[in-house]
Protein backbone atom coordinates (compact mmCIF):
# COMPACT_ATOMS: atom_id res chain seq x y z
CA UNK A 1 0.00 0.00 0.00
CA UNK A 2 2.53 2.67 1.05
CA UNK A 3 5.66 1.04 -0.37
CA UNK A 4 5.61 3.19 -3.50
CA UNK A 5 5.79 6.30 -1.33
CA UNK A 6 8.55 5.08 0.98
CA UNK A 7 11.07 5.28 -1.88
CA UNK A 8 10.16 8.87 -2.75
CA UNK A 9 12.64 11.71 -2.31
CA UNK A 10 12.03 14.87 -0.27
CA UNK A 11 12.11 18.02 -2.41
CA UNK A 12 10.69 21.33 -1.21
CA UNK A 13 7.65 22.09 -3.36
CA UNK A 14 7.51 18.50 -4.67
CA UNK A 15 4.06 17.36 -5.73
CA UNK A 16 4.88 13.87 -6.97
CA UNK A 17 6.92 14.68 -10.06
CA UNK A 18 9.05 11.77 -11.28
CA UNK A 19 12.75 12.57 -11.74
CA UNK A 20 15.12 9.76 -12.74
CA UNK A 21 12.39 7.25 -11.86
CA UNK A 22 11.84 8.60 -8.32
CA UNK A 23 8.80 10.58 -7.17
CA UNK A 24 9.52 13.84 -5.37
CA UNK A 25 7.40 15.24 -2.55
CA UNK A 26 7.46 17.76 0.23
CA UNK A 27 5.26 17.08 3.25
CA UNK A 28 2.15 18.72 1.78
CA UNK A 29 2.61 17.09 -1.63
CA UNK A 30 2.93 13.65 -0.02
CA UNK A 31 -0.16 14.16 2.14
CA UNK A 32 -2.23 15.29 -0.84
CA UNK A 33 -1.01 12.45 -3.09
CA UNK A 34 -1.72 9.77 -0.48
CA UNK A 35 -5.16 11.17 0.26
CA UNK A 36 -6.07 11.14 -3.44
CA UNK A 37 -4.24 8.07 -4.73
CA UNK A 38 -4.63 5.64 -1.82
CA UNK A 39 -7.78 6.85 -0.13
CA UNK A 40 -9.72 8.26 -3.09
CA UNK A 41 -10.36 11.57 -1.33
CA UNK A 42 -10.93 14.68 -3.42
CA UNK A 43 -8.11 17.12 -3.98
CA UNK A 44 -8.19 19.99 -1.53
CA UNK A 45 -8.53 23.48 -3.02
CA UNK A 46 -5.36 25.50 -3.61
CA UNK A 47 -4.95 28.26 -1.04
CA UNK A 48 -1.50 29.52 -1.97
CA UNK A 49 2.14 28.89 -1.16
CA UNK A 50 3.13 25.94 0.98
CA UNK A 51 6.90 25.86 1.42
CA UNK A 52 9.31 25.37 4.29
CA UNK A 53 11.09 28.48 3.00
CA UNK A 54 7.97 30.66 3.36
CA UNK A 55 6.47 29.92 6.78
CA UNK A 56 4.27 33.03 6.75
CA UNK A 57 2.78 32.06 3.39
CA UNK A 58 2.39 28.48 4.56
CA UNK A 59 0.71 29.72 7.77
CA UNK A 60 -1.80 31.72 5.73
CA UNK A 61 -2.54 28.65 3.60
CA UNK A 62 -2.89 26.51 6.73
CA UNK A 63 -5.46 28.91 8.20
CA UNK A 64 -7.51 28.50 5.01
CA UNK A 65 -7.26 24.71 5.14
CA UNK A 66 -8.05 24.66 8.86
CA UNK A 67 -11.23 26.61 8.10
CA UNK A 68 -12.15 24.22 5.30
CA UNK A 69 -11.59 20.99 7.29
CA UNK A 70 -12.94 19.98 10.69
CA UNK A 71 -10.55 19.46 13.59
CA UNK A 72 -10.98 16.12 15.31
CA UNK A 73 -9.39 12.84 16.33
CA UNK A 74 -6.90 11.08 14.06
CA UNK A 75 -8.56 8.95 11.36
CA UNK A 76 -7.33 7.60 8.04
CA UNK A 77 -7.10 10.51 5.60
CA UNK A 78 -6.79 13.20 8.26
CA UNK A 79 -4.09 15.82 7.87
CA UNK A 80 -1.76 15.78 10.89
CA UNK A 81 -0.64 19.40 11.29
CA UNK A 82 2.41 20.17 13.43
CA UNK A 83 2.01 23.51 15.19
CA UNK A 84 4.79 25.70 16.59
CA UNK A 85 3.58 28.90 18.15
CA UNK A 86 0.92 30.09 15.72
CA UNK A 87 2.49 28.47 12.66
CA UNK A 88 1.87 25.13 11.00
CA UNK A 89 5.42 23.98 10.26
CA UNK A 90 4.84 20.45 8.94
CA UNK A 91 2.09 18.03 7.90
CA UNK A 92 1.60 14.32 7.49
CA UNK A 93 -1.36 12.12 6.63
CA UNK A 94 -3.00 9.56 8.92
CA UNK A 95 -3.24 5.99 7.63
CA UNK A 96 -3.99 2.61 9.10
CA UNK A 97 -0.74 0.63 8.89
CA UNK A 98 -0.46 -2.92 10.22
CA UNK A 99 -3.85 -2.50 11.92
CA UNK A 100 -2.99 0.68 13.84
CA UNK A 101 -3.14 4.39 13.13
CA UNK A 102 0.08 6.01 11.98
CA UNK A 103 1.24 9.17 10.24
CA UNK A 104 3.07 9.04 6.91
CA UNK A 105 5.37 12.04 6.55
CA UNK A 106 8.43 13.30 4.75
CA UNK A 107 11.03 15.89 5.58
CA UNK A 108 14.50 16.82 4.44
CA UNK A 109 16.27 15.07 7.34
CA UNK A 110 14.50 11.69 7.28
CA UNK A 111 12.84 11.35 3.90
CA UNK A 112 9.54 9.47 3.79
CA UNK A 113 8.71 7.47 6.92
CA UNK A 114 5.75 6.45 9.00
CA UNK A 115 5.29 6.67 12.75
CA UNK A 116 2.57 5.38 15.05
CA UNK A 117 0.38 8.21 16.37
CA UNK A 118 1.92 8.19 19.90
CA UNK A 119 5.44 8.35 18.43
CA UNK A 120 4.46 11.16 16.06
CA UNK A 121 2.93 13.11 18.95
CA UNK A 122 6.06 12.62 21.07
CA UNK A 123 8.26 13.81 18.20
CA UNK A 124 6.05 16.79 17.41
CA UNK A 125 4.61 18.05 20.68
CA UNK A 126 1.62 19.95 19.28
CA UNK A 127 -0.37 18.17 16.58
CA UNK A 128 -3.83 18.97 15.27
CA UNK A 129 -5.78 16.57 13.08
CA UNK A 130 -7.97 17.95 10.31
CA UNK A 131 -10.64 15.79 8.71
CA UNK A 132 -12.75 16.12 5.61
CA UNK A 133 -16.28 16.85 6.72
CA UNK A 134 -17.50 13.56 5.24
CA UNK A 135 -14.87 11.24 6.83
Predicted regions and their residues:
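Intrinsically disordered, low-complexity, charged/polar segments
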Residues: 116-135
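N-terminal capping segments
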Residues: 1-69, 76, 82-85, 89-90, ...
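Catalytic Cys-His active-site segments of thiol-dependent hydrolases/isopeptidases
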Residues: 91-113
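Residue-level preference for short coil/turn positions at secondary-structure junctions
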Residues: 75-76, 99
Amino acid sequence: MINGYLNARYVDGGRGEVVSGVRQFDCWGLAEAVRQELLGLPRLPEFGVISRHDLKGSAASYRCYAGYLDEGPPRPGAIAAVIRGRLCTHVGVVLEIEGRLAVLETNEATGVRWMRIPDFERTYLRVRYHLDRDL
